[in-house]
Amino acid sequence: MHIADQSGAAAAQRKPLYAQLYVQVLVAITVGILLGHYYPSIGESMKPLGDAFIKLVKMIIAPVIFLTVATGIAGMSDLQKVGRVAGKAMLYFLTFSTLALIIGLVVANVVQPGAGFNIDPATLDASTVNTYAAKAHDQSVTGFLMNIIPGTIVGAFADGDILQVLFFSVLFGIALALVGDKGAPVLNFLQALMAPMFKLVSVLMKAAPIGAFGAMAFTIGKYGIGSVINLAMLVGTFYATSLLFVFVVLGAVCRYNGFSILSLLRYIKEELLLVLGTSSSEAALPSLMEKMEKAGAKRSVVGLVIPTGYSFNLDGTNIYMTLAALFIAQATNIHLSMGDQILLLLVAMLSSKGAAGITGAGFITLAATLSVVPSVPVAGMALILGVDRFMSECRALTNFIGNAVATLVVARWEGELDEAKLARALAGTADDSLPADIVPAE
């Protein structure tokens, strides 16, 4: 009997509510908020729990990407598909990333969240954002592109650099496909290795409530809910704009491609709560790759689109950058002409590519953008430093949802989406087992 048969039978029996991961994570987040609010010092001391969980997940990201991409590409009958999938993915990323930037710009002009602050730029303390500005100055388009090529294969895996691992995985998968039958033993080994690797993912996810509790307790304990009140207009505008983007823009994309955004959100609810609790979309990357494959997207598409999307398809970060930049300009009474705003948009399009899916990366990317746009003072970032952590959750969630949608859409464009399997998955009736080619027989 196959392991898949056993797991499929087990999946048919619904777990009680308290045993479901999304409920456990939701309870953990709530307890973390309460602890951080009423006992801030204890809440701050919970930080290692969140950090440890993220390190555990990052530990397996590189091997999961390598196995998924290498086996997916090596199993392709037509290697030209690799180029087509990559091209369609980049077209999607460029289109919707630019749209997210434009939406942030338009909303900031209409709502004017920074109006009325009347802050003199000369009084701003730039020392609080010097660290972020220094990191931002290290970024350049050439440096970013060169960094995709790893110095050594071992170094790429040791550092956990997603794009470097993806670059090597694609080349290895192509080479494995080109050697034909001689590569069959290697391909079989890698496919067999995927079973314990995905099992490890599910084991680590059981610790998600602990990680979410620690991260949320630290955030509330250190920054306090009260820090949001003074900048509630900015935070509220950002959350509302992100919701608009997810449910209207991405919702329309989903509907056009034959599925519902609400059904997709229900399907990935455990991962969404994990991202909410940790403020890191990377925390749920391995689990998302597994779920997208179970939802009917071919492994080759999943392996290419998701890791690439974590650098090139950051819708939440893009909305945040134009919205935050205009907020700073409005708060310091700096008028930005249409030309200035177009320059801001173009610079943001470049600097947003390569922003990692980790906590705080959006703030560094904003610093990189403002350092090139002379009209808006980088020191103005001090105004939003206190609430950036509370916007980080929304950035990460929007980025995560955007990549889930992108994977299914690109798979459908390429004819690599099993729509019947997707319908079952979104309806909650799918067999929650490993793909057939990575399930060992007895």
Curated annotation (Swiss-Prot):
Indicate how the chain sits in the lipid bilayer: Multi-pass membrane protein
The record's principal subcellular location, in a coarse class, is membrane
Q: What GO MF terms are annotated?
A: fumarate transmembrane transporter activity; malate:proton symporter activity; succinate transmembrane transporter activity
Q: Which GO terms describe its biological process?
A: L-aspartate transmembrane transport
List the GO cellular component terms. plasma membrane
Please name every pair of cysteines joined by a disulfide bond in this record: none
Q: Which cellular compartments is it found in?
A: Cell inner membrane
**Transmembrane segments in this chain: where?**
20-39, 52-74, 89-111, 141-158, 162-179, 200-221, 231-253, 342-364, 368-387
Q: Does the keyword Transmembrane apply?
A: yes
Give the highest taxon in the source lineage.
Answer: Bacteria
Q: By its UniProt entry, which SUPFAM superfamilies does this protein fall under?
A: Proton glutamate symport protein (SSF118215)
Q: Which UniProt keywords apply?
A: Cell inner membrane, Cell membrane, Membrane, Symport, Transmembrane, Transmembrane helix, Transport
InterPro entries (UniProt xref): C4_dicarb_transport (IPR023954), Na-dicarboxylate_symporter (IPR001991), Na-dicarboxylate_symporter_CS (IPR018107), Na:dicarbo_symporter_sf (IPR036458)
Note the HAMAP family from the entry. Answer: C4_dicarb_transport
Family label: Belongs to the dicarboxylate/amino acid:cation symporter (DAACS) (TC 2.A.23) family.
Job of this protein: Responsible for the transport of dicarboxylates such as succinate, fumarate, and malate from the periplasm across the membrane. This transport system plays an important role in the energy supply of rhizobium-legume symbionts.
Instruction: From the Swiss-Prot or TrEMBL record, give the protein name.
Output: C4-dicarboxylate transport protein 2
Q: Which organism is it from?
A: Mesorhizobium japonicum (strain LMG 29417 / CECT 9101 / MAFF 303099) (Mesorhizobium loti (strain MAFF 303099))
**Name of the coding gene:** dctA2
